[in-house]
Amino acid sequence: MAFTTYAIYPFADVDDNAGTASAVNETVPDTETAAGSDAGTGSSANADDAISYYNYKQEHQNDKDATKQVVINADNLIDAQGLQVGEYDAEDKTVLLNEDDSATWSFYAPETAMYAMTFYYHTVESKGRDMEFTFMIDGEFPYDSAGNLSLKRAWVDDGEIAVGANGNETAPYQKEVYKWMTATLKDNESYSSDTFLVYLTQGEHTYTVTSTREPIVIGTITFHGQETIPTQQEYVASVNATAGDYSGEPIVIQGELATEKSDSSLIPSYDRISPITQGVNSLENSAAKILRNTMGKNSWSHPGQWLSYTVDVPEDGWYSIGVRYLQNTQTGMAVCRNIYVDGKIPSQDFEGIDFRYDASWASLVVPGEDGTPSKIYLTKGQHEIKMEVTLGKWSDIM
């Protein structure tokens, strides 16, 4: 998917000719799977010999989700010999894993249940690739995908979109941001897009992480129940709203001006299909010149890739989110995106949003179940809006 702008709208419909744009081009990812357990019959000391995550889930389909959580401090190792343990970027309980390093922790599971795993980690200057690792429960891989996991980095534009002497625009170089990040382990390599879960019996267990590509600093690993995204009705009921629907002018965000992105390949692109596709340096498109007026296309197609934007909201109120987009590659199909607001998917309406095939540019306001625009409550000030590639409902089919 590629696009040129977000628009944070008054709680109303979007005009297809408003010049806000977004485009969706997507390829089907390679097959893979993942999740974890300490008691699965398919567990193995070799990831290649372990069962698939699909079979693992089937094996534990009647086991309950955890209602309690346990946090492992990364410096609380069984054996810290040869590892760098201590303070890193204002956090004092961390461990650095270089390539091929392993770390093992002992922890107590408070209940017999299925647990998700969330890493609090820091990127380290290296080759700029995704950080890959494996994990084992009690010395075994619970399923094959536990042998192939990855965590994303964060990138920003190193400068602005430049205009050359011939009028063509040049995309800026990408610069990595080294910072603390949080990610729940998900299956971004297969057809499922599932959150990886592990089955743990109540009691003591060990958890081993081995870095296989790129170094990584770990702060904490949290085992917890799978997050439940509320329905739109539940979300609205949970908001302590002090204002009504926003009725001002739309807040337009150029899609090519992402605040951060998950991959260095996500650079401003160009569109020559629509004359009204605006850019940061021009309100009109050009058939003759390269104007960096979109973001995405084929470089934004793999589950887990994301783009984030900062929006400055003028007043408290209820807002809808619209995207002008082009999705002209997956004929007869839709591609899907999750939308996060300040780090969370607000409601199920913002999960797995369909961007359907169209040979021309189209506009979409995130819809509710009845087709009318769904809404989010924003307070005055800055907020983060993030779009993430997901297979959405297609994962159930695949």
What name fits each language-model region?
Residues 1-9:
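Sec-dependent N-terminal signal peptides of Gram-positive bacterial secreted proteins and lipoproteins
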Residues 13-398:
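Extracytoplasmic
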